[in-house]
């Protein structure tokens, strides 16, 4: 019975999605043609005026964020599934360069239990999808950093940990220090501090997961 009822439920969901799209289009058209709603007259009750104010200040989703067809709806759900798998299995590549690496080791210890977020540290860049640059990046180390980054499979992300990795830190004016690892590799998350605590790096990992959750790569590819 469940197998027979599944197609019916799917059709009801798709029809509900279509009606929601039609309603949103009508709301956008009415707002564009009629303009902002006039202020309520004094004769209206307080309840009606409150409802009209709430309707005027309501946030309507943009049409560009909604699926335009059944195929795009399927692509959107597939995008959500892929993003869930990626953010739930982040494998960082350890690239400790200075004292920030000690706090990175602290975060990887059993106290914070990073396994519950799917974070597993790998020693090989070919098995990692996240690079944590922890410490001062010198000019001699910059080519090695770029080479390791190029060996990581797509999609890959970079977390810049500490003031030295973010912008040079104490050694900003040194002749032998790169003033920010974002001059060598693209950075997704910046973790401030000198050195940042293990909790700060943990918060940066959580922010990276939120960023991955918002990605819409398949949807952008499909709309091309």
Curated annotation (Swiss-Prot):
Keywords carried by this UniProt record: 4Fe-4S, Electron transport, Iron, Iron-sulfur, Membrane, Metal-binding, Mitochondrion, Mitochondrion inner membrane, NAD, Oxidoreductase, Phosphoprotein, Respiratory chain, Transit peptide, Translocase, Transport, Ubiquinone
Domain of life: Eukaryota
Keyword 4Fe-4S: yes
UniProt subcellular location: Mitochondrion inner membrane
Reactions catalysed according to its record: a ubiquinone + NADH + 5 H(+)(in) = a ubiquinol + NAD(+) + 4 H(+)(out)
Residues making up the signal peptide according to the UniProt record: none
Cofactor(s) essential for the protein: [4Fe-4S] cluster
InterPro entries: NADH_UbQ_OxRdtase-like_20kDa, NADH_UQ_OxRdtase_20Kd_su
Cofactor binding comment, as recorded: Binds 1 [4Fe-4S] cluster.
GO cellular component: mitochondrial inner membrane; mitochondrion; respiratory chain complex I
Post-translational modification: Hydroxylated ar Arg-111 by NDUFAF5 early in the pathway of assembly of complex I, before the formation of the juncture between peripheral and membrane arms.
Positions bound to [4Fe-4S] cluster: 99-100, 164, 194
EC number assigned by the record: 7.1.1.2
Protein's membrane topology: Peripheral membrane protein
Positions carrying Phosphoserine: 39, 41
Gene3D superfamilies to which the protein is assigned, alphabetical: 3.40.50.12280
Family classification: Belongs to the complex I 20 kDa subunit family.
Subunit structure comment from the entry: Core subunit of respiratory chain NADH dehydrogenase (Complex I) which is composed of 45 different subunits. This is a component of the iron-sulfur (IP) fragment of the enzyme.
HAMAP family named among the record's database cross-references: NDH1_NuoB
Name used for this protein in its record: NADH dehydrogenase [ubiquinone] iron-sulfur protein 7, mitochondrial
Gene: Ndufs7
